[in-house]
Amino acid sequence: MEQRSFFIKTYGCQMNLRDSEIIAQILNNNGYVETSEIGGADLVLLNTCSIRAKAEQKVMSKLGELRRNKKINPRMQICVAGCVAQQEGKQIQAKMPHVDLVIGTQYIYAINELLERSRTEGPITATNLDDKYVIPQFIPETTGKEHEGEFRKFVTIMQGCNNFCTYCVVPYTRGREVSRSIKDIVEEITVLVKSGIKEITLLGQNVNSYAQTNTVTEDDTPATFSDLLRQVAAVEGLKRLRFTTSNPKDLSNDLMQCFKDLDVLCPQFHLPVQAGSNKVLKEMGRKYTVESYLDLVTQLRENCPEIAITTDIIVGFPGETDEEFEETMKMLETVRYHGSFSFKYSDRPGTKANELTNKVDESVKSARLARFQARQDEIGLERNQEYIGTTQEVLIEELRDGEIKGRMGTNHIVHAIGLTNKKPGDFLMAHVTAAGQHSLRGSIVEE
């Protein structure tokens, strides 16, 4: 088998990172070797994101650069994958004729066959979405070295979304919701844990709706995301379990109970609210209210008092008034999030919000975002200061010069000084003595 080299550049979310890992393993299994040198690679694959216009612009700019690389290295194949590929399809090759292959989000498992075809047939676009798509079984390689030095992994449990929020392209770029079987997921995680992985994060566009659209059990009995969590938590050797992301409308009492029942489930919940105004939420198509959201926050904290709640915020949605933005600021003050990801609204082609005419001025959006982020930083610092004087279990990520960098179960980063014989991937206790906006400082507790 002829050996070829490949280079993957990943844009966007954790789903894309996991997809890139899957693509890399498939390529490795078919004789490819990964390289860090993009210019000399036989294959350059851009795994793209279209959640905001800026991400698309970065991809097109990189494709322009690759035109020059391909002139120097005519053997190079260029592949565009991910959400930009799904959204733009043949338009990519019309604008960038040096692109050999455009594959949508349901075609990553066929990457090798499509590359072979493009070498003989010329440019190929594979982006048709199938409503009856089934995610193929995927078990990671386990020769013993694949995960050397790694201790944290993402595992995709479902793909697509059926919510059709008016600002979001995901249902159009990832297709309808489809869930992997519990058996496949547990088998993948078991293999990863046996190879040394300590922490697993389950991924889906809306994990709360896992198993709502297709059967995930061998005997076709109904199942829920909570059922999956309980089975994954039982995998021997798994130390920490997380998941992302969730839609509040599907958050069940049983899922909240899992934070009481499952020791490995980290006390962290990313619960996107997007806006603090019922009018804006309705325009966004979010299907919950401010009141129902706040009730969920209360219940989560009752079930798990130490839980750290984070969120997503969009400012400047079409028609958002000053008064409605103030309601979002009130939401921030009420919940006092440990952290948030906040963005200015960005028009996305094909979405309902894109057709709205009452757009908010860019300068107003910028001012609102700056104000929200400044207050979030203040609250984040105040939240972090609550940990001063406590002793926390930390999973070591880095170790250098008498200091460790690690992460708590709440996902807070901790820098702790002191001597230890432990290495990255091990756990230790750290006494927190100081707090910043985005991390904590402390000292290693001697055993």
Swiss-Prot record:
Its main location: cytoplasm. It is found in: Cytoplasm. GO terms for molecular function: 4 iron, 4 sulfur cluster binding; metal ion binding; N6-isopentenyladenosine methylthiotransferase activity. Its EC number is 2.8.4.3. PROSITE patterns: MTTASE_N, MTTASE_RADICAL, RADICAL_SAM, TRAM. [4Fe-4S] cluster 2 binds at residues 161, 165, 168. This is tRNA-2-methylthio-N(6)-dimethylallyladenosine synthase. The gene is miaB.
